[in-house]
Amino acid sequence: MTQVVLGENEGIDSALRRFKRQVSKAGILADVKYHRHFETPLERRKRKAVAARRKRRF
């Protein structure tokens, strides 16, 4: 869980920026995106195959 503690003279804007950066680095939004709907084993294999093809292309 990501937590941001406000400093004594810190504004809300900078704290929000720090929070967004921490969430992005932790990969929380990507995890939520993948768990939004159930992914069948077939869909998982297809997604991984497409990712492997993309990775191989570069």
From Swiss-Prot:
GO biological process, any: translation
PROSITE patterns: RIBOSOMAL_S21 (PS01181)
Pfam families the record matches: Ribosomal_S21
InterPro entries hit by this protein: Ribosomal_bS21, Ribosomal_bS21_CS, Ribosomal_bS21_sf
Keyword Electron transport: no
Gene Ontology MF terms in the entry: structural constituent of ribosome
Gene3D superfamilies: Ribosomal protein S8
Keyword Magnesium recorded: no
Keyword field: Ribonucleoprotein, Ribosomal protein
Annotated Gene Ontology cellular component terms: ribonucleoprotein complex; ribosome
Cross-referenced NCBIfam families: S21p (TIGR00030)
Protein family: Belongs to the bacterial ribosomal protein bS21 family.
Protein name per UniProt: Small ribosomal subunit protein bS21B
Natural source organism: Trichormus variabilis (strain ATCC 29413 / PCC 7937)
Species lineage: Bacteria, Bacillati, Cyanobacteriota, Cyanophyceae, Nostocales
